[in-house]
UniProtKB/Swiss-Prot annotation:
Its job: RNA-binding protein implicated in the regulation of several post-transcriptional events. Involved in pre-mRNA alternative splicing, mRNA translation and stability. Mediates exon inclusion and/or exclusion in pre-mRNA that are subject to tissue-specific and developmentally regulated alternative splicing. Specifically activates exon 5 inclusion of TNNT2 in embryonic, but not adult, skeletal muscle. Activates TNNT2 exon 5 inclusion by antagonizing the repressive effect of PTB.
Species of the source: Rattus norvegicus
Cellular compartments annotated: Nucleus; Cytoplasm
GO cellular component: cytoplasm; nucleus; ribonucleoprotein complex
Name listed for the protein in its UniProt record: CUGBP Elav-like family member 2
Underlying gene: Celf2
Length: 508
């Protein structure tokens, strides 16, 4: 195996090799002899651009003799500059695998932000060990390696057979078998999987492809993400259960804002929910109705709707102001069309307070216990619509709703469709192993995700550790920012912020 002609020509300089022979560096390090027939050519990413073959040789040689190193360089630069990745071939397969186990996702080189990425080059994948290695489960603990070889040798040449044993040297009831080709391994699976129940086993024999390193990392990340999302859900549910006492506090703030006409302190709420002074006044009145409903629901008042109805009568809207015969029900219908309650609830869900959600829940409960009387059917219908609109924002705290949403939004992974202004997020500091599905699952609890994309380096085929998520509304985006910005995954904390508009020079 020789250095490809495309390798960049550098000045010839003599390098002293560990075996005492001299060798020239001409874009790669070559030896006069050849590597083993089963040697693996490895791709290595996340290396400093300033490193040459000499520094890389010093990095790899502790794991075995190096046959060849080829740094990928950008020919458009003069002189050509390293792309931060290379190919390395050891003399033995064992040395390559030992280097991968010691370096991949473990060692971070000076000046780099992410650990080394080391895997078989694309040219090696056609016959990679991981594609020919089988896991054999439900094996009798009385079997040894020879018994397993005899059992699987009819399907082709076996390169390796190993039974997993505990510290005491006893079999754990499973084994690994590596064939010479993938076709042999596939034939063994078809013929042997669940074909018999061996002595001392409770289930038929299991024959399948062994988990790859990527499978193991993906499963570890999924478990870690599931644990962290469970913690987030638990914290959110704790906030939801204690919302009853928040209504009076925020009712006072809203009343103060509407009575003083000085809404400067609430500018953030206005911008987030798109509210004007009239809408804030409506919200304050509705909160008062919620408080009255909470009181009347626990009292023996024969007509608990009276105080609530009087409070609802004060609701105003552009429609009600221009129509002399408008009723409280009409005012409520116009209020629901404004989306005010949904905006405020969505902006605060799962964080410190969800006063709008609590108010609507109390109001819905108080009215629902009394039935539809005295012409309040229109009002009840409007309240039900408003409350139903808010319920979607509690999905972050309800695992069942989360699971349903997961099934509905799988098509969003990998797409790059943009949502409305203010609904598109930029996420940085993603783990190297995260893909489109991982980022989708992480941000789905906060609303309807229409696209989720992790960006990949076209040269190295590795994640750039950032991506974009788009919702169908700005409220969900704000909820995701407040909940996930600074959220820790492994050793990193996510950076979540709004994606800049197309008018800006940079997307983030």
């Amino acid at each position: 195996m020789r250095c490809p002609k495309s390798a960049v020509t550098m000045r010839n300089e003599e390098l002293l090799l560990s075996n005492g022979t001299a060798n020239k560096m001409n874009g790669a390090l070559d030896h006069s002899d050849q590597p083993d027939p089963d040697a693996i050519k490895m791709f290595v990413g996340q290396i400093p651009r300033s490193w040459s073959e000499k520094e890389l040789k010093e990095l790899f040689e502790p794991y075995g003799a190096v046959y060849q190193i080829n740094v990928l360089r950008d020919r458009s630069q003069n002189p050509p500059q390293s792309k931060g990745c290379c190919f390395v071939t050891f003399y033995t397969r064992k040395a390559a695998l030992e280097a991968q186990n010691a370096l991949h996702n473990i060692k971070t080189l000076p000046g780099m932000h992410h650990p080394i990425q080391m895997k078989p080059a694309d040219s090696e994948k056609s016959n990679a060990v991981e594609d020919r290695k089988l896991f054999i489960g439900m094996v009798s603990k009385k079997c040894n390696e020879n018994d397993i070889r005899v059992m699987f040798s009819p399907f082709g040449q076996i390169e390796e057979c190993r039974i997993l044993r505990g510290p005491d040297g006893l079999s754990r009831g499973c084994a690994f078998v590596t064939f010479s080709t993938r076709a042999m391994a596939q034939n063994a699976i078809k013929a042997m999987h669940q074909s018999q129940t061996m002595e001392g086993c409770s289930s038929p024999i299991v024959v399948k492809f062994a988990d790859t390193q990527k499978d193991k990392e993906q499963r570890r990340l999924q478990q870690q993400l599931a644990q962290q999302m469970q913690q987030l859900n638990t914290a959110t549910w704790g906030n939801l259960t204690g919302l009853g006492g928040l209504t009076p506090q925020y009712l006072a703030l809203l009343q103060q804002a509407t009575s003083s006409s000085n809404l400067g302190a609430f500018s953030g709420i206005q911008q987030m929910a798109g509210m004007n002074a009239l809408q804030l006044q409506n919200l304050a009145t509705l909160a008062a109705a919620a408080a009255a409903a909470q009181t009347s629901a626990t009292s023996t008042n024969a007509n608990p709707l009276s105080s609530t109805s009087s409070a609802l009568g004060a609701l105003t809207s552009p429609v009600a102001a221009s129509t002399p015969n408008s009723t409280a029900g009409a005012a409520m219908n116009s209020l629901t069309s404004l989306g005010t309650l949904q905006g405020l609830a969505g902006a605060t869900v799962g964080l410190n307070n969800i006063n709008a959600l609590a108010g609507m829940a109390a109001l819905n409960g108080g009215l629902g216990a009394t039935g539809l009387t005295n012409g309040t059917a229109g009002t009840m219908d409007a309240l039900t619509q408003a409350y139903s609109g808010i319920q979607q924002y509690a999905a972050a705290a309800l695992p069942t709703l989360y699971s349903q949403s997961l099934l509905q939004q799988q098509s969003a992974a990998g797409s790059q469709k943009e949502g409305p202004e203010g609904a598109n997020l930029f996420i940085y500091h993603l783990p190297q192993e995260f893909g489109d599905q991982d980022i989708l699952q992480m941000f789905m609890p906060f609303g309807n995700v229409i696209s989720a994309k992790v960006f990949i380096d076209k040269q190295t085929n590795l994640s750039k550790c950032f991506g974009f998520v788009s919702y169908d509304n700005p409220v969900s985006a704000q909820a995701a920012i407040q909940a996930m910005n600074g959220f820790q995954i492994g050793m990193k904390r996510l950076k979540v912020q709004l994606k800049r508009s197309k008018n800006d020079s940079k997307p983030y």
